[in-house]
Amino acid sequence: MEASGERAAVVRRLMEVKEESGKTFSEIAAETGLTNVYVAQLLRRQAHLKADTVPALRAALPTLTDELVQLMMQPPFRSYNPDIVQEPAIYRLNEAVMHFGESIKEIINEEFGDGIMSAIDFYCSVDKVQGADGKDRVVVTFDGKYLPYTEQKSEHMMSRPTRKTS
């Protein structure tokens, strides 16, 4: 587990590498075949860099050091600073999910049944589009695998010892 100070120092270094490249998250994403949000997650140490992605990321970010690559390839300690919820853009995203969440849940249940959207087998992207009025609009896409809740039958519980009956 990374200490928060150590993680912050690594994130600062990674963001400096991005800054030196002069590229946006979306430009790096286009060069690496990743989503723009996943690139941001990698550079914020919220995602695990896979070995087969290293060459493309190195090409996109030429000043990325071996040391940083090695750190990025370690499973991260995924967390967030609770104070970040106060940041206006994050606050509004949270507000939107809370406001629309109950309706979204109902539609998931109607379309799929009793279950949830995975945040593990999950893709996320942020895109800029022009609205009908010609003004810029933000499109946030959450693309998660559907996971049905299971009926908990004891016969399917593999960790439960088999009971012998007399």
UniProtKB/Swiss-Prot annotation:
The keyword Lyase applies. GO terms for molecular function: cyanate hydratase activity; DNA binding; identical protein binding. It catalyses: cyanate + hydrogencarbonate + 3 H(+) = NH4(+) + 2 CO2. Keywords: Lyase. The keyword 4Fe-4S does not apply. NCBIfam families: cynS. This is Cyanate hydratase. It comes from Sorghum bicolor (Sorghum).
